[in-house]
A protein has these predicted regions:
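N-terminal leader/linker segments that precede catalytic domains of diphosphate-processing enzymes
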Residues: 1-240
Length: 240
């Protein structure tokens, strides 16, 4: 099965350093999991009509441009935050409107240059649903107020990366393996500036492998991926 191209965004702010996470709807894939805003790339994200409406697209391949547009679109649709070229803000514009019209009506240009890739994960070949997901980090001002869409997400919260990892380890929050690994990497930073600087490192494409053992299935990733962890239990939604 060919994986679907997808983008997700680690939206971060200072004072204190936190990342925006959302709780998935209990009726959807990865039910009630704590995730970053994100989703699959649409055909409209590839449109040439975007060219006069984006900033920072010079030198980007068409697919990379579409990925960043999708990342910005999902951030707006799920959290109400528009990642514009000058600053991120929450425009009073219906989220049901086509995203390209949202940007036009807001009178801004999307800040594609403010989206920095920090991860690339492709779902295991045996996964029931496969996504080719590109992870980005984007900084916003400390007073940015996200607004839950009430559809795919039922709650939004700012949380310190290390705290999110603690909750996952304690079993009080459901956070899937790729999300935890990117939280772990983000927790190495202590400010938006540090997180953006860390995003300058080369990105390793991770293709996890699911193995059967006497104690059940495990998912493995290469040590070269640099996450400091090489195995975990796969989420049930990955294998069913």
């Amino acid at each position: 099965m060919t994986p679907r191209l997808a983008a997700t965004v680690l939206v971060v702010r200072d004072d204190p350093f936190e990342v925006l996470m959302m709780e998935r709807n209990a009726r959807m894939l990865f039910a009630s999991a704590l995730v970053f805003p994100g989703g699959t790339v649409d055909g409209a994200d590839f449109s040439e009509h975007w060219l006069p409406l984006v900033d920072g697209a010079s030198g980007l391949e068409q697919e990379e441009r579409a990925l960043r547009i999708a990342a910005a679109r999902e951030t707006f649709e799920e959290a109400g935050i528009l990642l514009a070229e000058s600053s991120a803000f929450a425009p009073d514009i219906p989220r049901s409107m086509r995203f390209i019209d949202v940007v036009r009506n807001a009178g801004v240009r999307l800040g594609l240059g403010g989206l920095h890739k920090i991860g690339h994960w492709i779902a295991p070949e045996v996964a029931a649903r496969r996504f080719d997901t590109h992870f980005y980090v984007a900084g916003v001002s400390a007073d940015t107020i996200p607004v839950c869409d009430g559809g795919e997400s039922v709650a939004l919260e700012w949380i310190a990366p290390a705290r999110a990892l603690e909750l996952a380890e304690a079993g009080s929050r459901n956070i899937i393996f790729p999300t935890r690994m990117n939280l772990k990497r983000l927790a190495e930073s202590h400010s938006v500036a540090e997180a953006l600087e860390a995003a300058r490192r080369p990105v390793y494409t991770v293709l996890p492998v699911i193995e059967a053992t006497r104690d059940g299935h495990i998912v493995r990733i290469p040590a070269e991926a640099g996450y400091g962890t090489t195995c975990d239990r796969p989420h049930p939604d990955v294998t069913r």
